[in-house]
Amino acid sequence: MENKKVIVGISGGVDSSVSALLLKQQGYDVTGVFMKNWEEDDTDEFCSAEQDIADAQAVCDSIGIPFKKINFAAEYWDNVFEHFLIEYKAGRTPNPDILCNKEIKFKAFLSYVHLLGGDYIATGHYARTRVLEDGSVQLVKGLDDNKDQTYFLYTLGQEQLRQTIFPIGNIEKSKVREIAKENNLVTFDKKDSTGICFIGERKFKEFLSKFLPAQKGEIHDENGIKIGMHDGLMYYTIGQRQGLGIGGVKDRPEVPWFAAKKDLENNVLIAVQGHDHPLLFKQSLQAIELSWVAGMAPADKFRCAAKVRYRQKDQSCEVEVNQDGSVNVTFDQPQRAITPGQSVVFYIDDVCLGGGVII
């Protein structure tokens, strides 16, 4: 550890602030780096980004470590945002946070860390690593199960994990805030960021319409009867209730409507009534673009647990790896609102095995 150089990604939030502090206390040579991944185009977003930079700088000054800024906006646009638009255009619902970790934080940033002569990269993710006797590294859930972020990190491989430290992986979120307060870090009571990093808190629909022309179409029930109009399939996600705009439909009970399926060919959104409507449930899925943390799948066929969305409880399933590398996943219990474009992530106990993109 003595004089090992760690470059920590400082976002201006409490998690990365405490990560930097703990590394400094543990005797590492620490530098904080703020990654700018998006060029803001509206005043509110700009002010919020400026505040994050100011907070990141203040934290580094307070801890007594150097602070740097790096602009990855071009890389982000090319490798994350354009993919995001392609997916939405195809009617899928991508997860840009997963792609951002893969392409920016643990690729572009990692290369930059090497340029700075860093031995390790560190982030404020709630995750852990475990080194096995054979030298391989496991990606392990964060101690705070409620905050575990391995779902977003499943694309990381051995090479990246060997060079990564997750300083708060062994700590509960409440304790992280406590540490920040005790050490007078300005971010101690800053609320957690929500929303996609490049949209922040602003209205998603409004944002997306700037980049993709929407094509309005009809909403049908499961029997093909028209019950309303949609603003563009890309604005809806499977299982969504809000914003469907289906009012009282003649001769139908006053039960909420949910988006169940997208018929891309005919530009039709299929909606059903009731949170637990059978059409919202599936017992199996197929996924592509698999990433295995160990470098390969545990076996051609194996049992494990899986999540089809962040913070979902682990669901028991069987995974079968196909010749082309894709997987078929069969769950013990039917799963609600499995969404194409989102990721399915696999676990055995607290170990994240990897995952793929649902089709």
UniProtKB/Swiss-Prot annotation:
Disulfide bonds join C100-C197. The record marks H125, Q342 as: Interaction with tRNA. SUPFAM superfamilies: Adenine nucleotide alpha hydrolases-like (SSF52402). It catalyses: S-sulfanyl-L-cysteinyl-[protein] + uridine(34) in tRNA + AH2 + ATP = 2-thiouridine(34) in tRNA + L-cysteinyl-[protein] + A + AMP + diphosphate + H(+). Its EC number is 2.8.1.13. One of its GO terms (molecular function) is tRNA binding. Belongs to the MnmA/TRMU family. This is tRNA-specific 2-thiouridylase MnmA. It comes from Francisella tularensis subsp. novicida (strain U112).
